[in-house]
Design a protein with these regions (language model features):
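ATP-dependent adenylation/nucleotidyltransferase module used to activate substrates
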Residues: 1-126
Length: 126
């Protein structure tokens, strides 16, 4: 009988392929459950199989997000400085929104709206 891989084992095999094949690996990290699981799997893999190797982490900061999400993202990125190369991006890009009947999009971190920003830009962002 052929043994089926469980999800964790399959993930470890796939991470090996990724880290063997690519010199630079980046994870897009929102602070949500899916990207959190992937980021932590990558960190654990590197600590176990490739100590000293770096992992790029890209976080697009939307300005108006839950405070707990922002705190979790900051805590997670700060807790692995030996592994993570963090790219914390705070740029005024066009984001669709469903919270207004008059506008179909908004721009976080727009300089022209600085007076009404939900919070100040983090000092470590691009």
């Amino acid at each position: 009988m052929i043994r089926q891989l469980n999800v964790y084992e399959a993930t470890q095999r796939r991470l090996k392929i990724i880290f063997d094949y690519f010199d630079y690996v980046y994870v897009s990290f929102s602070g949500g459950k899916d990207s959190s699981v992937l980021l932590n799997l990558c960190i654990d893999y590197l600590r176990k199989y490739e100590p000293g190797r770096k992992l790029g982490v890209f976080h697009m900061d939307y300005e108006a997000q839950y405070r707990q999400t922002t705190e979790y993202v900051e805590q997670t990125m700060a807790s692995h400085p030996d592994i993570l190369e963090v790219y914390h991006c705070c740029v005024p890009f066009k984001v669709s929104t469903c919270t207004s009947m008059y506008q179909s999009y908004w721009r976080p971190w727009g300089e022209s709206k600085r007076g009404i920003w939900v919070r100040e830009k983090p000092k470590d962002c691009y």
